[in-house]
Regions:
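Short, small/polar-rich loop/turn modules that mediate ligand/substrate recognition or access, typified
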Residues: 91, 177, 182, 236-238
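Residue(s) in the substrate-gating loop at a strand-loop-helix junction
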Residues: 145
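Conserved glycine-rich cofactor-binding loop
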Residues: 10, 17-18, 41
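Alpha-helical segment proximal to the catalytic Tyr-Lys
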Residues: 130, 174-178, 234
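Substrate-binding pocket helix/loop in short-chain dehydrogenase/reductase
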Residues: 101-114, 206
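C-terminal substrate-recognition "lid" of short-chain dehydrogenase/reductases
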Residues: 214-243, 248-249
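Active-site helix of classical SDR
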Residues: 125, 161, 169
Length: 250
């Protein structure tokens, strides 16, 4: 029977201490998964774990500043150990969204964006997906952005890093799909998270441009990620699902 139940499975969610990552960790736990909450801020991470446990779920916090291959491999090893040797769901959510015009864009910032948004998922998958393939089952979900599909002033570097992640999603589906590992991505539009609240009314104006007409809550994105993590999405493979209120459709 096809179900969204994740009981008995362990999920690793990066960037899980706030926003979409936090909402995803909570959503996966509510579907029965044991969740490994990965992030930089221990205080916020412990708070997410406490919220999950208070709701009857199981979770643990794994600290880490994800920015390169070494940090990704280190997290993969610690997460696998914490999971008792088996990670069933990987959500690559950690990301950097620094904006700015092309002229004068700092090279260190450029490298940082591509390091966290592209290199980290690449090496996490390289460490975790082979074991999934060996078991014949697993789900990987990458968190992208609508800026990967449309030109947005000031988002050239950020959008390019996520566009590359979309291609990796398809490449990994081709590489690991025959072994039973599903790899998909979600592409959110405007979402009300702490990192964009500084935009104030501008955020609402951007959200109003979509057919949905409003700015999404993190839980609306998390619900789609949780769906992709489950057997309810058993025939969804290599997809980049737009969860943007229809913004890229018009």
């Amino acid at each position: 029977m096809i179900t969204d139940d994740l009981t008995g499975r362990t999920a690793l969610v990066t960037g899980a201490t706030s926003g979409i990552g936090k909402a995803t960790a909570i959503a996966l736990a509510r579907q029965g998964a044991r969740v490994l909450v990965a992030g930089r801020d221990k205080g916020r991470g412990d708070a997410v774990v406490a919220a999950i446990r208070a709701d009857g779920g199981e979770a643990g916090f794994l600290p880490g500043d994800l920015h390169d291959a070494l940090s990704a491999k280190d997290l993969a090893q610690r997460a696998t150990q914490a999971a008792g040797g088996q990670i069933d769901v990987l959500v690559n959510n950690a990301g950097i969204g620094t904006l700015g015009p092309t002229q004068g864009f700092d090279e260190a910032t450029f490298d940082s964006i591509f390091g966290t948004n592209l290199k980290v998922p690449f090496y996490l998958v390289g460490e975790i997906a082979p074991a999934m393939a060996g078991r014949g089952k697993g789900s990987i979900i990458n968190v992208s952005t609508m800026a990967a599909e449309m030109g947005v002033p000031g988002m050239a570097v950020y959008g390019a890093s996520k566009a590359a992640l979309n291609l990796l999603t398809q490449s990994w589906a081709a590489e690991y799909g025959p072994s039973g590992v599903r790899v998909n991505a979600v592409s959110p539009g405007t979402v009300r998270t702490p990192s964009v609240e500084v935009l104030g009314e501008v955020l609402d104006q951007i959200g109003a441009q979509s057919p949905a007409g409003y700015v999404a809550q993190p839980e609306e994105i998390a619900a789609v990620i949780a769906f992709l993590a489950s057997d309810a999405a058993s025939y969804v493979q290599g997809a980049v699902l737009n969860v943007d209120g229809g913004r890229t459709a018009v």
